[in-house]
Curated annotation (Swiss-Prot):
Protein name: Cathepsin L2
Enzyme Commission number(s) of this protein: 3.4.22.15
Similarity comment: family membership: Belongs to the peptidase C1 family.
Domain of life: Eukaryota
Subunit composition and interactions: Dimer of a heavy and a light chain linked by disulfide bonds.
EC category name: hydrolase
GO MF term (any one): cysteine-type endopeptidase activity
Catalytic activity: Specificity close to that of papain. As compared to cathepsin B, cathepsin L exhibits higher activity toward protein substrates, but has little activity on Z-Arg-Arg-NHMec, and no peptidyl-dipeptidase activity
GO BP term, example: proteolysis
């Protein structure tokens, strides 16, 4: 997913 405020859990974006 995209490192967005919602998809950060998928992308590893903390």
């Amino acid at each position: 997913a995209v490192p967005d405020k919602i998809d950060r859990r998928e992308s590893g974006y903390v």
